[in-house]
Amino acid sequence: MSRTMEWAARPEHLGGIPRKLVIAMVGTFAKTVSSFLNTTSVHNADTLLRLVRSRPRRVPLITISNHMSTLDDPAMWGFKGFPIFDTKLARWVLAAEDICFRNALYSYIFRVGKCIPITRGGGIYQEHMNEALERLNDGEWVSICILFQKER
């Protein structure tokens, strides 16, 4: 069984139930972390929410964010007003293959959670970058989290 599990990434997989469960669990975790366990400040949240919810059909959205840990992407879902239970509005994210796709269980969970496996340092001409392009061509949202190091 391939660790990339393209079949698990399809919205119709098992009637969409696994995706709904994973998105709801991650959304609930994010809301708990962002709202109750941390002080969160979001700049221009209204702009992001408008783009996620109201952009014209078939118009893609790309977001790029800096991150410090592997929890940064899911924790971003927790700010006020973010649609944490809507699988259609949830983003696709490029996810490090060596962390998120280490075994069949992780691969399955991350694929139904709309993660695209990427080999860090593999450049732009790698297999799953084409999947990210397909998602964008379908008008979906692709999020890219990059570690931008501060200059010293």
Residue ranges and their predicted role:
Residues 39-152:
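Soluble catalytic domains of membrane acyltransferases
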Residues 2-46, 78, 82, 104-113:
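A transmembrane-helix-recognition feature enriched in membrane-embedded lipid enzymes
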